[in-house]
Amino acid sequence: MYRLSSCLRRRSRPAGAWVAVGVLMAGCSASVSGDTTESDASSSISATSSQTSTMPPGSGTTSPGTPSDTTATAAQAPFVPRTITVVMNGDVLLHGGLWTTAEIDAADTGRGDMDFRPLLSDLKPLVSGADLAVCHMETPLAPRGGPYASYPVFSVPPAIVPALKWTGYDACTTASNHSIDQGFDGLARTLDYFDAAGIEHAGTAATRQASREPLVMDVNGIKVGLVSATYGTNGIPLPSAQPWSVPLINIAKIERMAARATDEGADIVMVALHWGLEYMHEPTDDQVAIANQLTRSPDIDFVYGHHAHVVQPYDKVNGKWVVYGLGNMVAQQLTSVEGVDDGNSCRVTFRERPDGSFRVQKLEYIPTMITPFDGVHPTRVLNVPQDVDDPEFAQLRPQLQATDDRVGTVVTSLGADKRGVTEGQ
């Protein structure tokens, strides 16, 4: 995985318009099972390079009785499409109660003072089973040993990072309304932790140069670009010396970053937005308008979001998939609002076409649930379809079923199920 790495196979721009030659996770003109409308979106990136023949003219001809030349043979070889699966999750929002959970678990596992791995362990098969898995780090990370701070101005334990890596996350988006809760130093420190753990990141930047470079990852030979931006920073001014450190939602800038990803060989470009209104299941007019503009870009294939802390619908806009809100992946919000403990993992499978582009072959939502913390039993994030009928979780079955029902109702409220979106596991 790398930034701005070059790739021989690119999208060309005939007659001034970009044509996808290999699309990213952004859902450009890909078809979902059961949906005859195509929307491009792919998450595998080809890093193979072609070679130019240096043979003199005529040297490729064959004499009578020799086998047909290799070029003709290659041209007749059957096309074998490649596929790639990408999993995305919503907010990683570490309220103080979750630190207690990690302390309780660390006492059992012996892994330091805090161990967040048990918190996420139920998601590990789903996350690690994807070709590419992307999380969203909502808040800045504190120095090792603290001090730590919870809502409303966060500085959270860095022990979450090795837990995310262990769970199977390859990359995290970092642009959010809390990005500069601890100033530029906190922002840069957070990225340092991700770098040290080998987790790629998109969104916030520690240098001006990095702020201009989209993340382009090589996933089994397919290049996937990722662009991240946020609606704002809770009224905290951007650092005067580093105003570029947090990318705000700006249509023209996002489109330019997506185009740069394409120029650097991205087969698929995905845009992750921190947007919407908290605790609102319905996308706002602004979300709908932004989605309408971004999905018209030939360089953007799939758009998804977070921030509302509740699940929002999936929809197809201009032939491309938009996931308005994934809900919380992990949080402990002290509110009576129904649905803050609900989330969903979005899993998209892309399939290569003969022209080298990728289409969405399958789009799934997997409901997740955050269990309550009672001061004794540690919190867990559960894969709902996997656990709802498991005897181990019999006492939680009513809550699991309620989460399953709520998430399914919201995700399909704009008709995504009629276009082939299904519940996965």
Question: PLM features: residue spans?
Answer:
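Sec-dependent bacterial lipoprotein signal peptides
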Residues: M1-A26
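Acidic, metal/ion-coordinating pockets
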Residues: Y2-L8, S29, M55, G60, ...
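Short stretches within intrinsically disordered, low-complexity N-terminal or propeptide regions
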Residues: A17-G22, V32, S43, S49
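Bacterial lipoprotein signal-peptidase II cleavage site
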Residues: C28-E38
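Intrinsically disordered, low-complexity segments enriched in small/polar and acidic residues
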Residues: T37-A41, S46-A47, T412, T422
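Juxtamembrane proline-rich low-complexity "stalk" or linker regions positioned immediately after a signal peptide
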Residues: D40-T62
